Curated annotation (Swiss-Prot):
The keyword Magnesium does not apply. The gene is Dtnb. The coiled coil domain may mediate the interaction with dystrophin. Keywords: Acetylation, Cell membrane, Cell projection, Coiled coil, Cytoplasm, Membrane, Metal-binding, Nucleus, Phosphoprotein, Synapse, Zinc, Zinc-finger. It is found in: Cytoplasm; Postsynaptic density; Cell projection, Dendrite; Basal cell membrane. A zinc finger (ZZ-type) spans 238-294. This is Dystrobrevin beta. Its main location: cytoplasm. It comes from Mus musculus. Phosphorylated by PKA. Phosphorylation at Thr-11 alters the interaction with KIF5A. SUPFAM superfamilies: EF-hand (SSF47473), RING/U-box (SSF57850). InterPro entries: Distrobrevin (IPR017432), EF-hand-dom_pair (IPR011992), EF-hand_dom_typ1 (IPR015153), EF-hand_dom_typ2 (IPR015154), KCMF1/Dystrophin (IPR050774), Znf_ZZ (IPR000433), Znf_ZZ_sf (IPR043145).
Length: 659
């Protein structure tokens, strides 16, 4: 007893699962009943994965389960309904890729419980065929035009006229869907529902039915049906517009623009819940937008419309013939084949399709004639299909095609079973059949080997794509080491950039100093180089490309430096920083030696000038220049980070000896 009670509670929980999930979505806060109903049914459609099945797949499932041969009032059990639903989802999984497979068992359970709750409220355990077709055709995915055409085919007679009794029955079944999601007070069935759809028309054809159902606005009792399709179309539409109430930067889905307030726009969540701010009111007329157009596109469209360049709007649906097509004449195409003996007459069909009796000839002469007759029959069948412009329009046409194919297959089987071959060709046919069997066996073996190879490669690929535990343990260490190496590389690049920048600044200073020395040497040979004459020391100009990359050559770092320094340092682009600094040190040493000689030659004049400057409180110019030169040499010696102590001692010795 306890186990039975637990099973009953589990079954009830499964039946109520879809409704519990729907209540969790909080659709009841939507103010307008039309949007509330459409949102609920759209949720049921997506939760049951019916949006992945179009109307043509539904028709195929109906035929596979024999529902097309049953009368609309025939009742089927819940177990047979479960079989129909199972075939729908299993066929769906065959069409979907392996990465998008659905849970078939869960989808079957959700849809079955929803249909039973909607259409078997009395608990009889039976549903009519028309109820199943109406519900699945309404809730499946695909185009609304295709749905309405199929629904009209179920409600029309052989002359293509809609029967109002069938329409009333369809509305009764279709309006059970809003009632199932607790929207019965707004969209429940009434006896006057048919006349609200077609108030004056007496003869309703297909085009008139489509015009009424796809009009804007549609019939009031079915206004939620086209809205549910529009919801499916705009779920992923992006609007780069800010909502005037919640101030979100963009919108998804519908966008609503007030026709009275200037530039007042709401997202679908705010509009559905009745939010308003500022001077806007819920009583204002709102325009629904399902797409976004840029201002430039709107302007071009307005100009084209004013100039009459915009083409006329296409009709909402193509115009279909008023008269339904006639069924195929199966007896004319493939007449029944009687079972005959060797001496009986056979019927050969020419391309015209008229049967003519002939005597059976010998086997060698009869086979080509039979093949020619079969080819002519197939050609006439193809020509007949080409002239049929709407083969897939009516569901009855598929039944006739199935019967045609079945009869044609039975005819071929009867010919193959009743036709006896002459003994002269028995050995030849046996050898040919043996060779064909051998060829088939070889092809099957090759196919089996190819499948095994594909399976082996797939396993190898999966094993290679899945990391082993050892690799998983080594990966963090490798990543940490790689991160340290990158950090060290960045530090070295920054250090190299700083050295290059410092070197370039020193070269600019030396260039200015050498220009000053040359100017004083040409003007007054006995005068020491000073900063006199009101000429300021040129300051270094920072290049934007100095710190961008540390891999440029020496010539790049000497851009903007005078010719003397470039000649001293332009010893080849392949030298490294240490060699460039050593060459620079040699050049500076030579320059310093010539400078010191000039200083010694004019010592007396410098002492006298220094005495006068000291009296005036100013430092001697030669002393200032010497200090500046020593400071410059010290900075250059410090830039030689990679030079050896021997090279440094040689450089200092050269400087000291020269001094």
């Amino acid at each position: 007893m306890i186990e039975e009670g637990g099973n009953k509670r589990k079954t009830m929980a499964e039946k109520r699962q879809l409704f519990i999930e729907m209540r969790a979505q909080n659709f009841d806060v939507i103010r307008l009943s039309t949007y509330r109903t459409a949102c609920k049914l759209r949720f049921v459609q997506k939760r049951c994965n019916l949006h992945l099945v179009d109307i043509w797949n539904m028709i195929e499932a109906f035929r596979d389960n024999g529902l097309n041969t049953l009368d609309h009032s025939t009742e089927i059990s819940v177990s047979r309904l479960e079989t129909v639903i199972s075939s729908i989802y299993y066929q769906l999984n065959k069409r979907l890729p392996s990465t998008h497979q659905i849970s078939v068992e869960q989808s079957i359970s959700l849809l079955l419980n929803f249909m039973v709750a909607a259409y078997d409220s009395e608990g009889r355990g039976k549903l009519t065929v028309f109820s199943v077709k109406a519900m699945l055709a309404t809730m499946c995915g695909g185009k609304m035009l295709d749905k309405l055409r199929y629904i009209f085919s179920q409600m029309s007679d052989s002359n293509g006229l809609m029967m109002f009794g069938k329409l009333d029955q369809f509305l009764k079944e279709a309006l059970k869907l809003p009632t199932a999601v607790f929207e019965g007070p707004s969209f429940g069935y009434t006896e006057h529902a048919v006349r609200t759809c077609f108030p004056q028309q007496k003869k309703i054809m297909l085009n008139m039915f489509l015009d009424t159902m796809m009009a804007d606005p549609p019939p009031q009792c079915l206004v939620w049906l086209p809205l549910m399709h529009r919801l499916a179309h705009v779920e992923n539409v992006f609007h780069p517009v800010e909502c005037s109430y919640c101030h979100c930067e963009s919108m998804m889905g519908f966008r609503y623009r007030c026709q009275q307030c200037h530039n007042y726009q709401l997202c679908q969540n705010c509009f559905w819940r009745g939010h308003a701010s500022g001077a806007h009111s819920n009583q204002h007329q709102m325009k629904e937008h399902s797409s976004w157009k840029s201002p430039a596109k709107k302007l071009s469209h307005a100009i084209s419309k004013s100039l009459g360049c915009v083409p006329s709007r296409e009709p909402p649906h193509p115009v279909f013939p008023e008269q339904p097509e006639k069924p195929l004449d199966l007896a004319h195409l493939v007449p029944p084949r009687p079972l005959t003996n060797m001496n009986d007459t056979v019927v050969s069909h020419m391309s015209s399709g008229v049967p003519t009796p002939t005597k059976r000839l010998q086997y060698s002469q009869d086979m080509p004639n039979l093949l020619a007759d079969e080819h002519a029959l197939i050609a006439s069948y193809v020509a007949r299909l080409q002239h049929c412009t709407r083969v897939l329009d009516s569901p009855s046409r598929l039944d006739e095609e199935h019967r045609l194919i079945a009869r044609y297959a039975a005819r071929l089987a009867a010919e193959a079973g009743n036709m006896t071959r002459p003994p002269t060709d028995a050995s030849f046919n046996f050898d040919a059949n043996k060779q064909q069997r051998q060829l088939i066996a070889e092809l099957e073996n090759k196919n089996r080997e190819i499948l095994q190879e594909i399976q082996r490669l797939r396993l190898e690929h999966e094993q290679a794509s899945q990391p082993t535990p050892e690799k998983a343990q080594q990966n963090p260490m490798l990543l940490a080491e790689l991160r340290l190496l990158r950090q060290r590389k960045d530090e070295l690049e920054q250090r190299m950039s700083a050295l290059q920048e410092s070197r370039r600044e020193l070269m600019v200073q030396l260039e200015g100093l050498m220009k000053l020395l040359k100017a004083q040497a040409t003007g007054s040979p006995h005068t020491s180089p000073t900063h006199g004459g009101g000429r300021p020391m040129p300051m270094p100009v920072r290049s934007t490309s100095a710190g961008s990359t540390p891999t440029h050559g020496p010539q790049d770092s000497l851009s903007g430096v005078g010719g003397d320094v470039q000649e001293a340092f332009a010893q080849g682009t392949r030298r490294n920083l240490r060699n460039d600094l050593l060459v620079a040190a040699d050049s500076i040493t030579n320059t310093m030696s010539s400078l010191v000689k000039e200083l010694h030659s004019g010592a007396e004049a410098e002492e006298q000038a220094g005495t006068e400057k000291t009296r005036e409180g100013l430092p001697p110019r030669g002393t200032f220049l010497s200090v500046f030169l020593l400071h410059t040499w010290t900075k250059l010696a410090g830039c030689q980070t990679h030079s050896t102590s021997r090279e440094r001692s040689q450089a200092y010795g050269k400087w000291g000896g020269t001094a």
